[in-house]
Amino acid sequence: MVIYGYIRVSTREQNEVRQLNALGGWGILPENLFTDKQSGKDFERPGWLDLMGRLDRGDLLVVQSIDRLGRNYTEILEWWRYITKDRQADIVVLDMPLLDTRAKGEDLTGAF
C-alpha cells in the first residue's frame, strides 16, 4: 500500500502550507505528494492526472478537504467512484471523518 497526498490551491498566490501541515502526520513520501496550483473547476490538472496514473489497488489517497479535489459535485462523485470502485483504493478526507473509505460497514462512512 502506498499513501498518496493531494494538495490544490486555486491560485499561484495562495499557500499550500496549511494543507501540507494537515497531511504531515500520514508518512507521505515527497514523491507521493501531488500539488496543483490552479482552479478546481475541472479535473484537467497535471498533478491530479499524474496521481491518478499512479494510484493502484489498496493504495490510500489523503486530502485535507473535499473541496481540494474540485468544485464540481458531479465530477467529484465520478472521480470518487473511479478511485474507490475501479482502482479499489481508499480515500481519507481529513476535515470530514465520515468520508473515510477504509471503514467498511453498513453506515454512511465512506459513502459519497
Residue ranges, per PLM feature:
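Short, structured surface patches at the beginning of a domain
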Residues: 1-112
